[in-house]
Regions:
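One-carbon transfer enzymes
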Residues: 1-116
Length: 116
C-alpha cells in the first residue's frame, strides 16, 4: 500500500476521480476512499477500481451531512481532493484539514460557485 492516502469527494461523472486513479501507479499515493453526496457515476468508477465508497446523501442527512462527512474521513488521510464535489465545505472542516484540501473546480468559485 502506498504511503500517501487520498480521499476523493465527487458528485458527478467521476472524470477527475478516474484521472487520479489512472496516475496512482506513477506517483506515491493511494486513493483510500471515495465520498459522494448523491447517487452518481463516480460510484461506478470506484466499484470498477475496488475503491471503497461512502454515499452521504445531503438531501436526506440535512444539517447532519457535514458531521457525517467529517466522521467518514479516515484519520490517516494526507489529502482530500474535491473532484467536482458540489457541497461547499464549512470552515470547521477546512480548519481541521488545513493545507490538506484541494478543490478541482474548473472555474472561478467567486464567479461560478453555484449554490453548493
Amino acid at each position: 500500500m502506498k504511503s500517501f492516502n487520498i480521499v476523493v469527494c465527487a458528485s458527478g461523472g467521476g472524470g477527475n476521480f478516474r484521472s487520479l486513479i489512472n496516475h496512482q501507479s506513477s506517483y506515491d499515493y493511494h486513493i483510500s476512499l471515495l465520498i459522494v453526496d448523491r447517487e452518481c457515476k463516480a460510484i461506478n468508477v470506484a466499484n470498477e477500481n475496488n475503491i471503497p465508497c461512502i454515499v452521504l446523501e445531503k438531501k436526506f442527512l440535512g444539517d447532519s451531512f457535514f458531521e457525517e462527512f467529517a466522521k467518514a474521513i479516515p484519520p490517516d488521510t494526507n489529502l482530500i481532493v474535491l473532484a467536482g464535489f458540489f457541497p461547499i465545505i464549512p470552515q470547521c472542516i477546512c480548519d481541521k484539514w488545513e493545507r490538506k484540501i484541494i478543490n478541482t473546480h474548473p472555474s472561478l468559485l467567486s464567479e461560478y460557485g453555484g449554490k453548493g
